[in-house]
Amino acid sequence: MRSPNAKRTRCAQALAGLTIAVLACTSYGADWIVSGNDGKYQRVEGRDTYPDNPKPDTLTLLDASRFPPQVKVQVEVENGIQGPPQAVAITPDANIALVGAPTRYDYAAKKLLMDSFVQVVDLQASPPVVARLDIGSHPQGIAIDRSGRLALVACVDGSVAVLGIDGNRVTLRDTLKIAQKRLAGVSFTHDGRHALVALRDEQGVAVLNVDDGRVTDSGLRLASGVAPYTIDVSSDGKWAVVSDVGLAGLPSYAGKLAGDADDVTLIDVSHEPFRAVQHVTVPSLPEGVAISPDGKWIGVQAMDGSNLTPDNPGRHARGKVVLFAIRDGQAVKVSEAPGGEAAQGIAFTADSKYLIVQFNVEKQLAFFAVNGGHLRDTGQRIALSGGPSSLRTTPR
């Protein structure tokens, strides 16, 4: 059995030089993005496996201000693929990263264990320091506001953990119960006055009020498709988008699925009350969704049957990356390209020119050019030691 603490120490020491390089840079001009990577899990033709002698889970820090993006830091953490690919977050100054979805695999019992802490990664320490903050339930989606002082964590028990950030110190301020079952993704609105939370098992999207660090449930619920999962909000303050992963995202669903189409929900957040205005059909299991910082594009990463076993008629070898334009208040499909096998998260670079997609099975980050609405795989890849499973940019 590997010793997580010993391995974490060795990895941190080896990466000290990289951390110093980051310390030499300022956040000005950088485009910081974090990827959480599951080293213990491997999907093999649609089947979950946990190979012996796994590599550690990791957090990778990228600077995407130039193309191709560059890896600046990698540090060992505890992170799993189970849940929405938004279980990481990073402060605007890139000093602190938060990591959720902590999982361990018990090889003797052949059972996955889920922990109830958020990891606080001090990226400015040399080597990086990882601390744990218990929040009482298994954390899924994480979001940090643009001030860098407040974070929200959506949990599997239906609660939202409210975290305060002061320098490199993170504390649990409050726990807000908004549902009885699992939550998934969470995102702040651009002005920081609200947050949207995906009610994965109970359906719909909850709207929270945020006032000077105090978070309350507004009581407003927005329509979604089945099993709302990931959420992103545009930097122009106009739109939010939610991926709805369908029956496959419901708890203990026992039926056989053959890659049915799912959908993405477009929400108008330009004025209150917020309102869902469109449900757009996409290929099955849209794990990741993102809105470009300039508010023009929506990127969707859909598995499209690439998560299914070879005997399933809905099986495809690769998923799809789909691009929509936002025109006259509606999302219009303009392009698509082959993606990875059972891929996960997706994010735009700060200049809105590229999409970063997590190719989980291939253990790669892939880069697609938006090209004015003509999606193109650049062929650029960043190899990772584990399957990438969560992806977030700094708050924009």
Label each residue range with its predicted role.
Residues 2-15:
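Bacterial N-terminal signal peptides that target proteins for export
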Residues 14-24:
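Bacterial N-terminal signal peptides
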Residues 25-396:
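Predominantly soluble domains enriched in secretory-pathway, periplasmic, or organellar proteins
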